[in-house]
Amino acid sequence: MSAHCQVTGRKPGFGKSVSHSHVRTNRRWDPNIQRKTYYLPSEGRRITLTVSAKGIKTIDRDGIEAVVARLRARGEKI
């Protein structure tokens, strides 16, 4: 499972970890990605989305139907 939110488009951030002695090593900051299953009443079926915590809040605020409509308008296959 890739660390990519289908709703918000959030991806990992990349940078450096800096130790006490200032040695820099590569690291990445992963978004809080969850696999969530939602029921689409208009289609009578469930869909599974890979969403971040902010994406879950967006779905709670706007509704799953509106979010799925935006995803399909963007060309994403659901």
From Swiss-Prot:
InterPro entries: Ribosomal_bL28, Ribosomal_bL28/bL31-like_sf, Ribosomal_bL28_bact-type, Ribosomal_bL28_sf. SUPFAM superfamilies: L28p-like. Residues 1-28 are annotated as: Disordered. The keyword Ribonucleoprotein applies. Keywords: Ribonucleoprotein, Ribosomal protein. Gene3D superfamilies: Ribosomal protein L28/L24. GO terms for biological process: translation. The keyword NAD does not apply. GO terms for cellular component: ribonucleoprotein complex; ribosome. One of its GO terms (molecular function) is structural constituent of ribosome. Belongs to the bacterial ribosomal protein bL28 family. NCBIfam families: L28. This is Large ribosomal subunit protein bL28B. The gene is rpmB2.
